UniProtKB/Swiss-Prot annotation:
Main function: Plays an essential role in the repair of DNA double-strand breaks by homologous recombination and in the repair of interstrand DNA cross-links (ICLs) by promoting FANCD2 monoubiquitination by FANCL and participating in recruitment to DNA repair sites. The FANCI-FANCD2 complex binds and scans double-stranded DNA (dsDNA) for DNA damage; this complex stalls at DNA junctions between double-stranded DNA and single-stranded DNA. Participates in S phase and G2 phase checkpoint activation upon DNA damage.
Outcome (variant: K523R): Abolishes monoubiquitination by FANCL and UBE2T
An MF annotation (GO) of this entry: DNA binding
Complex formation: Homodimer. Part of a FANCI-FANCD2 heterodimeric complex that binds and scans dsDNA for DNA damage. Interacts with FANCL. Interacts with MTMR15/FAN1. Interacts with POLN. Interacts with UBL5; the interaction promotes FANCI homodimerization.
Annotated disorder: Fanconi anemia complementation group I: A disorder affecting all bone marrow elements and resulting in anemia, leukopenia and thrombopenia. It is associated with cardiac, renal and limb malformations, dermal pigmentary changes, and a predisposition to the development of malignancies. At the cellular level it is associated with hypersensitivity to DNA-damaging agents, chromosomal instability (increased chromosome breakage) and defective DNA repair.
Region (Disordered): 1300-1328
Organism of this sequence: Homo sapiens (Human)
Covalent cross-link site, Glycyl lysine isopeptide (Lys-Gly) (interchain with G-Cter in ubiquitin): K523
Post-translational modification: Monoubiquitinated by FANCL on Lys-523 during S phase and upon genotoxic stress. Deubiquitinated by USP1 as cells enter G2/M, or once DNA repair is completed. Monoubiquitination requires the FANCA-FANCB-FANCC-FANCE-FANCF-FANCG-FANCM complex. Ubiquitination is required for binding to chromatin, DNA repair, and normal cell cycle progression. Monoubiquitination is stimulated by DNA-binding. Phosphorylated in response to DNA damage by ATM and/or ATR. Phosphorylation of FANCI promotes ubiquitination of FANCD2, which prevents DNA release from the FANCI-FANCD2 complex.
Protein name: Fanconi anemia group I protein
Subcellular location as annotated: Nucleus; Cytoplasm
Family membership: Belongs to the Fanconi anemia group I protein family.
Amino acid sequence: MDQKILSLAAEKTADKLQEFLQTLREGDLTNLLQNQAVKGKVAGALLRAIFKGSPCSEEAGTLRRRKIYTCCIQLVESGDLQKEIASEIIGLLMLEAHHFPGPLLVELANEFISAVREGSLVNGKSLELLPIILTALATKKENLAYGKGVLSGEECKKQLINTLCSGRWDQQYVIQLTSMFKDVPLTAEEVEFVVEKALSMFSKMNLQEIPPLVYQLLVLSSKGSRKSVLEGIIAFFSALDKQHNEEQSGDELLDVVTVPSGELRHVEGTIILHIVFAIKLDYELGRELVKHLKVGQQGDSNNNLSPFSIALLLSVTRIQRFQDQVLDLLKTSVVKSFKDLQLLQGSKFLQNLVPHRSYVSTMILEVVKNSVHSWDHVTQGLVELGFILMDSYGPKKVLDGKTIETSPSLSRMPNQHACKLGANILLETFKIHEMIRQEILEQVLNRVVTRASSPISHFLDLLSNIVMYAPLVLQSCSSKVTEAFDYLSFLPLQTVQRLLKAVQPLLKVSMSMRDCLILVLRKAMFANQLDARKSAVAGFLLLLKNFKVLGSLSSSQCSQSLSVSQVHVDVHSHYNSVANETFCLEIMDSLRRCLSQQADVRLMLYEGFYDVLRRNSQLANSVMQTLLSQLKQFYEPKPDLLPPLKLEACILTQGDKISLQEPLDYLLCCIQHCLAWYKNTVIPLQQGEEEEEEEEAFYEDLDDILESITNRMIKSELEDFELDKSADFSQSTSIGIKNNICAFLVMGVCEVLIEYNFSISSFSKNRFEDILSLFMCYKKLSDILNEKAGKAKTKMANKTSDSLLSMKFVSSLLTALFRDSIQSHQESLSVLRSSNEFMRYAVNVALQKVQQLKETGHVSGPDGQNPEKIFQNLCDITRVLLWRYTSIPTSVEESGKKEKGKSISLLCLEGLQKIFSAVQQFYQPKIQQFLRALDVTDKEGEEREDADVSVTQRTAFQIRQFQRSLLNLLSSQEEDFNSKEALLLVTVLTSLSKLLEPSSPQFVQMLSWTSKICKENSREDALFCKSLMNLLFSLHVSYKSPVILLRDLSQDIHGHLGDIDQDVEVEKTNHFAIVNLRTAAPTVCLLVLSQAEKVLEEVDWLITKLKGQVSQETLSEEASSQATLPNQPVEKAIIMQLGTLLTFFHELVQTALPSGSCVDTLLKDLCKMYTTLTALVRYYLQVCQSSGGIPKNMEKLVKLSGSHLTPLCYSFISYVQNKSKSLNYTGEKKEKPAAVATAMARVLRETKPIPNLIFAIEQYEKFLIHLSKKSKVNLMQHMKLSTSRDFKIKGNILDMVLREDGEDENEEGTASEHGGQNKEPAKKKRKK
């Protein structure tokens, strides 16, 4: 039969073939086809013949085709056919599909849809036919019966697609079904059906099956619905990430983790690559991605951003067209996230309303962590983002040349956090990705070298961390580091020091790098620039510290803790200690040459030698011998000669120029510290060992010299130095400059000898008498210099250099003076205690050291760079100062003795204030340890019991002591009130209050105590009032919103200053006694306005957040109506805040404020108030349809603004302008040009915000009209539209002024400017 059909088909006409086919029974043809296909014979040719003999022009032929199609589809799905045969059959069916009439196409399509929905497909091969059927159907123009109605082919296709997408899809055919739609012409609506269906299948599929489905979706997105595709993919993987993190965070209920981490990351990586590839082919997709993620920035950026979407954005940066805008989007998101965090941390009001969320910074670092799973496409974007953040938000140079570094007040700023995040991104990326390391290192070094004039500490910190992580790995990049060495001579000293310190571990593992550095340093030592020479000294000293000679004491013996990286390097590099000794001695030889260079170079050497000894004790002889031979040049060996030092030799005279050549005081200081260290550390370890006599004599020599200098300095008079009162100390003559230098040298030597004698005194009375004699020499010179500087009306001579006393000594001295109660010490200590001036000097030096720590992060002198030692000294000093201040109050001390300068108690308090600030700045993690050290009752045995005492409890104990002191001060009469001490006490309390936990009872007690002080004490000191009120506000905002407090204060201000209407008598409320006629304005007024501004900022932030949520949730009316319910508490809080603030402004706009900053600030804040009200109205314009109107409390707020604020604003404007006119008038009368100019400038400043305010009011009213129409509530009934504003321009007056143009050009110009400013809002009002 098959042969006959084939032979008939070979004829030119199909008539005989048709006739033959009609004679066959129904099942014969299908059975024949089935047998032929299964056997793998000529099924294709047979099928072509059947189609040729079954033309669609005849009904019989059409039905036969229909049956053959059904048979073939079943055959292909059965899986019995060979692949080639099945493909051939499907190909033929595709070719013939277009010949089918519409109704049969509909039937065929329904068959497919039923098979898909019922899951009866076996292998899905036949699905390749469905897109052809749907395409063919869309081309049919005639109307077709579908369901109960009649539809066109296009409409039928739409219904069929809808039916298909609304039914069940078997998991294994999802990809195939999605893929087939790319071959069907689809409308936007049809694409949306398909996309929604495919996205809904994500959660039902195996993870490995999602990438190919995403690929098909991206191909399909070229037809439309790009936004839905991207949103769906991002939302799914963001949710999966969140679920995965929750599972990994150790939820005990989840025994099995849903998805292994590695598998999830690989799948995400593949999908990101698919999307990036799709964007390269379709830029519209990229624009849609950026647009979608940008929307999130308007509200809450954390809603749209997730680790997955961030990784996707970073990968997109590889496409040039999107690189800048994507990095800019990420940069903006990071800073916005940190600003939001800052705002939340500073306000309890916001914390109660906004739940804690993960921040963009955390997500980005998670991306870095995830990128270990072969996400190479993300790394370049991470590196670029890291450098952009560091470049944009690193420390900046300010006007006086100083750098704004990370300090406590600034470290919480968003910019600082963003810069730190950039460094963390780069460091973590460096650790994970080997291929990118060289690029990161190169870019960091480039910035260090090329931006020397800008602050680059953040890049040096990053470099240090990179080197610390893997010094051995970086050997491969050593060429980059050695290139940087070539620029050392041209870099600032501080940069050189930090750069060399950062790369120091590399020098231990790379000898070639070390040799290269030495060559560079030797050249620099003889460079013309002073900074280059100093850099050479810094470099050599660093090498001496870190290349230990065999036999040197270990770091523990030297009480010097080395960094983990250093130990790491030491373990891995078995360097030759003998070679090190030769190397170090060569360097010492080079450094000796520096002793003939400028004073600054020598000074660096003296300051560095002590650290060299501690780290490399075997160099002690070499160092000490160098120092001794240098000292002998300036030491007078004859025991009877006075003075004992040759000061003339320390000064260099070149023509008229006089300068210091030898910093003798620092040389002696260095000798004294090195000698003390050697005696305390090395000699005890050498006891019992035979030591060369020469060495013993050596150290005895130094002791003898210091002893001789001490004795002769005590005997010397100022005349011996030619520095008595009659000497010339002016800065304008060469003799004066020389005498100043000598005076400072003598004072420095005295300080060094004071410390030396105290260290060897063993509490000997004679030694202490010597110390006092040395101090008196110091004091005399200091007094002369101050007196001469005072007469010359210049503070040049008073700029004393840092004290040469070490911080450790200051700590020991203060403890001895104020806390030593050992009986055997009392007689000798009474010598020092008898001099108040000496005790004041000791406290002053402690203050100087703490100030130095606050400004630079370290102190001068030994261990000044060691944070641990500094912290220990700080604890000891604080304990003493605290005891001294609380034991002997200032009032007691000052009543006893009337001396010039501050009392010791006041100095102690000032010291405490500086220390509390410094500890929070540099030792935040050690606060607990610090507070425990202050507890005088603490004993070592009790430490374990006290370990669980919280920081808050310890802080509260300290706070109570200062509260008592302040109460005692406030109980005194106004004339006896010590404002300096009060101010310091409030500053200390403010500093300590930051350590209290806001939820603790101690915090509440502190707040109520501060509030009580403000309510019950009236002081006219403006600075004290300001600091106390600032404390009150800072506590209040951490506990609850300050709006009620602001309202009460505004009533007090109104009561004291009176009303703008002089006929109105204001009732005085007196909530806070601290507000009085002297402090009400400008002090308290400006403070409350500043706080009001912060509240408005918070409210504005909340409104923006709500608006962002609404714009994202308006996908459907149902979604948005459900979304408004959780927002109700936030809306209510916003309205409550604005309502109370409205009453606050209601009081202030009626207050007769003095001209100046108060009026100016009030007008600006009123403008902000109306802008915020407008923002709220616009929010309700967005939501009022879905939420069913506006809430009643919003109506009340609008009513309040119309009755209590707007009319009063216009009255206040009139009041301000009337005051301006009176000022003008009085200015003209006096006819003093300077006075007139000043008055006019003030008028201009105060009236400038008026047009802005009027415009803000009118904008508010404009949007209220829109809201009234939309909500069907008449909100404007409460608004009194002013028609008689006296700031409108009157035509006749304007003409008169214009005619007088030539008479007074300046004055008239100003008036017309005012007119122009005020005219615009008035016009707008008339337009309404």
